[in-house]
Structures are given as structure tokens and as C-alpha cells.
Amino acid sequence: HQRDGFARREMAANLCVGDEPPLVTVYFQAYNHLEDQTKMAIHAILENTQNVDYELLLVDNGSTDGTLDFFRSIEHPRKRIFHVRENRGALFGYLAAKGAAGNEFIRGRYFAAIPSDVVVTKDWLKNLVTCMESDPRIGMVVPAANYTSYYQQVKLEFSTYGEMQEAAAAYNVSDPKKWEERLRLIPTASLMRSSLRKMYEADYGFFYNFADDDLSFTYRRLGYRLMFCRDTFVYHAPGTAMSEEAYQTDLREGRETFRRKYFGVDAWTDTRLDDELCRKCMDPSTPREDNRILGIDVRCGANLLHFKNCLRAYDLGRATLSAFVQEAKYWVDLKTICSGEVFCQPLRDLEAALEGRTYDYIILGMPLADYEDPKALLEIMRDHLSIGGRMAGRMEEDGEVFSLERYE
């Protein structure tokens, strides 16, 4: 009754939102930078958020440059302003505003967060909502950006603000083939279900870095899908408010906090995408109604999802994901993305576990050279390939990709 659980969460979240709630609550927090960031960001929201019923939730987090007066001057039919007198960080600003508002802080069915250094573009919110409403299991969606990480970057040609908006307007055409399910998301901007936000919005053990990774893992383990919308572009100004030394310190501490919380899972190495490996394994000449895909030692399964996304993008059919891993710490996350079997056993049990099963694609997550008997492993993989099936992996860490096909 998982779907019933989704519906009950939505119903509970909507109990205290008052009459005629908006579809989306757009949240924007600012601390100074009125002229070089805030005005541009707000004007972009007002100009480019069309055909979506939204409220504007504005938080002035202790600014001293006239930000509050600017917020008051904004014309929008559904606008709420919160003024935090002293800046103690972005999280405190959010919590202070939330505490002042009570149960009606987030009124929309969906919650969109826009950082002050992000400029939205034409149809950004309409496109994200379209993706979100395509499946009740989708919990969070994010757009592409010019400056981001984890394969969420899209490069558009422009040299001025106007050119950027024109290029983005041409680019932002909703296309389900460009929606990619991910293990984790980097939210330059984001749209999430308010029901999830109200249930779990942050682990305060993370100061800055890895808080988003934690959010991704939590929502996915609750049964929700995380979607990257490659069909939508927003502009993210490069840079960080932290000093380089403080940033690197927070990276190290956040990464270790994440490892401890998730019993050894590393948010970087265990969710790594290998685009070259997936594309060299894929056979674009052979569409199938259902592609059976097995990942061996694929950690949390990022490459399994990426392969599934590639098949979708090229109209090569659906995908049923299965996995075999030797380390138990990956089992839970693989179960969140695999509709097929997930085996967690020593490698010596691989052949017995796969008995009677064949796959159209087999992806090897670890370098072949790291196995004690690479030849025996390749023979097992070959024996469990369907006729015309393919298997691929890397010979060594960051070495060449090998791809083999079974003809008979």
C-alpha cells in the first residue's frame, strides 16, 4: 500500500493550509547583495513564472542595504514578508520565519526554493511542475544550470543577461525524454513536495555541504524518486560566500558526517556516474520493450540509473534493474531503484544467484583488474547474457572501457 502512503502524506500536509492555497510556495531568502543579486533574482521570478499559481515567500535575513524596503515594494497578489533582525546564517533565517508563521508557513502543494544567486528563466516553474505531476512517486526535481556539479551542468552560449534569457527561453521546452532519475540532486533551484518538506526538511548536523545529499537519500529511502530536469535551465552565479579554507573544512566534516549517518556510504564515490561506460555498453540499434539490466558491484547504483536514463532518451525501451553487490551497505539504496532482484552475497555465490536468469545488459562497477579471477568473472557474465546482449566495465580504475557482445 505504498501509493496509499503517498496519498496520506499529501492529505496530512494539506490539513492546515487555509482556504484556496496556491499550487506552489516560492521561497526566497536574502542577506544584503540587493543591487548585485536580489533585485535581478526577484525580477526574474516575477517575469518568468507564468501559468502557475504561486505565492512568494520572502525572508530578509538581517540585511542592512534596503532589502526589506525592496521586498515591501514588490507587487505580487500573494506575497508574504518575514524580517529577521540579526543574521545568524541561512538556516536560522528559515527557522525564524517558519516559527513566526506557524502551520501556514508553506501553503502550497509544492515548495520551490530559489537561492539569491540564482536567476530563473522562462517556464522554469511550469516545466518543473510538469515533471513533478507526472508521477506521485516523484518527490523532488531540479533544473540544469551553467554552474553546478554532478552532471547537472548545461552550457548555453550567451554573454549578456538578455542573451542568457533568450537562450534559456529557446532551450526550456518540456521534454520527458530529458528527465533523468538520480540517486542524489544538487539543488541550484528545486521543487519538492510540501508533504516531504514538512516531514523532513534538514538534518542540522550538516552546516552547509552534504545537507542536500542527506535530503536526497532520505526522500529516496522513503520511496520517492529524484528527478533532474535537463529540459530546463537556470543561471547560477559562480562563487561562494564562504572562504576557501572554511569551505574545504566544511566539505571534509560534512562528508564524514554523511558517512557516519549512512553506515559507511560515501556521498561522492558511491554515487559516481560513469557516462562513458554506460554509453559504450548501450546498443542504440536494438530497441527492446523491456531491457533487463544487471549491475555487479555497482555500489549505490548510479550507473544503473544512468543507463536507464540513456535508454529512455534514445527511445530504446523500458528498463528492469537488478543488482549483485558484495557489501551490505549498498543494499538499501539499490532496493530504492531496482524493480528486479538485489543480491548481496560473496562473489563466489554469483553464479548460483544468477542461475536461470539472463540479462540484456550487464554493467561491472568495479575495475576488472581488482578481481582475483577476472577470466572466471567474465565467463559468468557472458553465460548470463541474452543473445545479442552486451556487457561492459573498465579494465582498471579510470582506465579504458571494454564492451563485449554475445552473438550465440
Residue ranges and their predicted role:
Residues H1-P22, A170-N172, Y247-E289:
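Non-catalytic membrane-proximal stalk/linker segments that position and tether the catalytic domains
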Residues H43-D53, R312-A313:
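Short, acidic, metal-binding catalytic loop of nucleotide-sugar glycosyltransferases
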Residues D60-D69:
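A conserved acidic beta->alpha catalytic loop
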Residues V84-F105:
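Glycine-rich, basic loop-to-helix element that forms the pyrophosphate-binding segment
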Residues R107-V119:
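Short beta-strand-to-loop acidic/aromatic patch adjacent to the donor-nucleotide binding site
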Residues V119, R182-A189, K198-Y235:
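Donor nucleotide-sugar recognition loop
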Residues V119-E157:
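Conserved donor NDP-sugar-binding/catalytic core segment of glycosyltransferases
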Residues A169-M192:
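A recurrent flexible, glycine/aromatic-enriched loop bordering the glycosyltransferase active site
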